[in-house]
Amino acid sequence: MDFILLIILSGVFLPDIISLQPIVGQEPGVTLSDEEQYYADEENNTDGNSVALHKLEENEMDTPANEKTGNYYKDIKQYVFTTPNIKGSEVSVTATTNLEFAVKKNYKASKPTASGEEEKPSESSRKTSTPNIPAFWTILSKAVNETAVSMDDKDQFFQPIPASDLNATNEDKLSELEEIKLKLMLGISLMTLVLLIPLLIFCFATLYKLRHLRDKSYESQYSINPELATLSYFHPTEGVSDTSFSKSADSNSYWVHNSSEMRRSRTRRSKSKPMDFSAGSNQTVLTDESSFLPPEETRFLLPEEPGKELIVERGPMQAMNEIDAQLLLNKEGSPSN
């Protein structure tokens, strides 16, 4: 690859060297100026480049693409690069994917006609070649002397804007917007207070009511009836031990529950069997009952209404005594029948 590039470059630059000799030999006695020499060299370069391009095109037509495979390149791309020159010329470079490129130069400047006109472009080219040197020294000298430097128009954007150019309406609008924001914040805070205070009051009231309802529910569950308390409570007599107290309490609670049933059975029997007994037999029975039964205990219950009289309720022992007496009477009356 390097060998091919050397051959191509030698074909490009050798015609330029050959073309320079006849120009100097044609006019040996005449000395050309620098500008005329420059333009003559450029023309010779263009002629040599055109000859080289024709040679390259002929070589492309003759040479095969690849001797080993025998296949030709189908996707060959061509790239063109153009670069402008300071003196007004343009350099365009064309390159392809098969490593073959060519250099072209296009010139826009025209040759001068008079000697006076020849000097002017040379001076202008010299001035334009170094345009920043005098400006740099002037700026540096002014900076050392602490003098104000007149900058370009673009630098004016970095200067501060005078206060007169600013609009006073912007400040008014900003102040109005700040006032509106403050009013909105105050309104929102007041609304939150107005909503939160009633909610707190309602919550405290509901909690207080729930507490009272809970207390009432406990009282209703464990309510005390004085009548039941007097019936269930047992008063032991003197000289009774703890064991007898517990047994008597059990028996008392048992007889309290069954006293009502006994009374109902007694009334039914009295209605179904009317009997006539003599006075002697009744007396004997009563004497026998008084001999082995304990004294009766009577209890008084207060009436629920003021118009009613006091109700005397017999104890469970009296009811048992009456039942036993009734049974004895039935036994005595059965043989007589």
Curated annotation (Swiss-Prot):
The chain crosses the membrane at residues 184-204. Sperm specific, including germ cells (at protein level). Residues 21-183 are lumenal. The modification Phosphoserine is found at residue 336. Coiled coil: none annotated. Residues 110-130, 259-283 are annotated as: Disordered. One of its GO terms (biological process) is acrosome assembly. The keyword Membrane applies. Changing residue 130 to A: Does not affect MN9 antibody detectability. Residues 205-337 are cytoplasmic. Residues 1-20 form the signal peptide. The keyword Signal applies. Glycans are attached at residue 145. GO terms for cellular component: acrosomal membrane; cytoplasm; early endosome; inner acrosomal membrane; nucleus; outer acrosomal membrane; plasma membrane. Highly N- and O-glycosylated; contains sialic acid. MN9 epitope is O-glycosylated. Keywords: Cytoplasm, Cytoplasmic vesicle, Glycoprotein, Membrane, Nucleus, Phosphoprotein, Signal, Transmembrane, Transmembrane helix. Pfam families: Afaf (PF15339). Interacts with SNAP25. Acrosomal membrane-anchored protein involved in the process of fertilization and in acrosome biogenesis. This is Equatorin. The lineage of its organism: Eukaryota, Metazoa, Chordata, Craniata, Vertebrata.
